[in-house]
Every structure is written in structure tokens, then in C-alpha cells.
């Protein structure tokens, strides 16, 4: 998978080259290129923003700069991803769908966002998805890109040591993942649930399912189908 990120703060994306993501790069499973948007500016000050039409606070990122940048780094077969609090929710299902893509391009906005015409123009030749990682506002799109890339890349074959690691994740079956335990059996007066020590795989699986349902019912009842939410 090829990943391109366009931003005015390339250093913000350095975590993409660390830990498991860095190992995925070393293995050739992904390639990551981070591009400084200011390369495509047209003035000596390398300005990327201007005052909004219609008035209002803040600044809007220029279409002239972004248009040239996307022309250069976003080919017709790529998926262009725009992190924005005004986007559709990014979910595990989104991550799974994107994991099948060959090329993702992320456009990191700042200030009051990017001129809408940038995406309207891009949509003439590429698929564009405006996506939100939550109902809150960040300073820019870079942190959201780190979240989304990690969620997607960990699903690629060979990135995680154990394929079941993501197959049993929260949201993989529509539920939150239940509690996890490791050694020692007893710690500060708290015990590992005996069922996990039984060696009975069927009973362990049933217990984990029950815990997953209980946690989802308590913390995210909106994820449950109507017939399960009141069980």
C-alpha cells in the first residue's frame, strides 16, 4: 500500500515511521511519503491561506496551492482522504474498506479548513472521502491522519504478528472487546477469572462473548441491535 500525506507540518507525521508502522515500511508492506504543502506556493512568503469570502474568523487554505499539490501527488486511481470534523464518521468498517486500497492520499487542513473547490475539483477525477474521527475539533488534520493510518495499516497482512489480533478487536464484530488478563494469577488482591484458567476453549469463548456484550451494553449501547440492548 502507498500512503501520501500533504501537510504544512511534515514533522508531525514522523510517528508514521516508528514502531509497527516503521517495521511495515522496512518489510516493504507500505510506503509513506510526506509532502510539504509549501512546495506548491506561488509567492515569496510561501503563504497557503487567505481571508474567507463572506467574512468570519480565521483563514481558509488556498485552492491554488492545494490544487497543484494534489495534481502532483494524487493519481487518478488513488483514494483522497480529507480529515474534517464535518466529515462522515471514521469507523472500523472504514478502516477495513480502506485496507483493500492500493493508494491513499491524505490532505491535512489547518485554520478554518481548505477551500471546498479543492475537493469538488478533485472529485472530477478521483474518489474523495471527507472523514471525521470524532465529534470534536483539532488544530489540524495531522493527528487524525496518524489515527486513521494506524487503524488501516494494522489490518494489512503481515503487519501484526498474529492475524487474530485484529480479528478479535473491538468493533470487528460490532461489539467492544472484553477485558484481558495475563500473569500473575493474583495481583494486589485481584484474581484472574477462573474460567480463563480452565483450559476449556468453548467456555472461554462463551465467557468472552458475554463480557463483550456486557461491556458494549454498558458503554456503547448504540452499537447493539434493538433485541440485544435490553437483554
Curated annotation (Swiss-Prot):
Question: Which GO molecular function annotations are given, in alphabetical order?
Answer: tRNA (guanine(37)-N1)-methyltransferase activity
Would I find Ion transport among this entry's keywords?
A: no
Q: Which residues make up the binding site for S-adenosyl-L-methionine?
A: 109, 133-138
Q: Which UniProt keywords apply?
A: Cytoplasm, Methyltransferase, S-adenosyl-L-methionine, Transferase, tRNA processing
**Residue runs in coiled coils:** none
**What EC number(s) does its UniProt record assign?**
2.1.1.228
Describe the protein's quaternary organization and the partners it interacts with. Homodimer.
Protein name in UniProt: tRNA (guanine-N(1)-)-methyltransferase
Species assigned in the record = Nocardia farcinica (strain IFM 10152)
Amino acid at each position: 500500500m502507498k500512503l501520501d500525506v500533504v501537510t504544512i507540518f511534515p514533522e508531525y507525521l514522523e510517528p508514521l515511521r516508528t514502531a509497527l508502522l516503521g517495521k511495515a515500511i522496512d518489510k516493504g508492506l507500505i510506503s509513506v511519503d510526506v509532502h510539504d504543502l509549501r512546495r506548491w506556493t506561488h509567492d515569496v512568503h510561501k503563504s497557503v491561506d487567505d481571508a474567507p469570502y463572506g467574512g468570519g474568523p480565521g483563514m481558509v487554505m488556498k485552492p491554488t496551492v492545494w490544487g497543484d499539490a494534489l495534481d502532483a501527488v494524487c493519481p487518478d486511481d488513488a483514494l483522497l482522504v480529507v480529515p474534517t470534523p464535518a466529515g462522515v464518521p471514521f469507523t472500523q468498517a472504514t478502516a477495513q474498506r480502506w485496507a483493500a486500497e492500493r493508494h491513499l492520499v491524505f490532505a491535512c487542513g489547518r485554520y478554518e479548513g481548505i477551500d471546498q473547490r479543492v475537493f469538488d475539483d478533485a472529485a472530477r477525477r478521483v474518489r474523495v472521502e471527507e472523514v471525521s474521527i470524532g465529534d470534536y475539533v483539532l488544530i489540524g488534520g495531522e493527528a487524525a491522519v496518524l489515527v486513521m493510518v494506524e487503524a488501516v495499516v494494522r489490518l494489512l497482512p503481515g503487519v501484526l504478528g498474529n492475524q487474530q489480533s485484529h480479528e478479535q478487536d473491538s468493533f470487528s464484530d460490532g461489539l467492544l472487546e472484553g477485558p484481558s488478563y495475563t500473569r500473575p494469577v493474583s495481583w494486589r488482591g485481584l484474581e484472574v477469572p477462573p474460567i480463563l484458567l480452565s483450559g476449556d476453549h468453548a467456555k472461554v469463548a462463551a465467557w468472552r462473548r458475554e463480557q463483550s456484550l456486557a461491556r458494549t451494553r454498558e458503554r456503547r449501547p448504540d452499537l447493539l441491535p434493538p433485541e440485544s440492548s435490553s437483554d
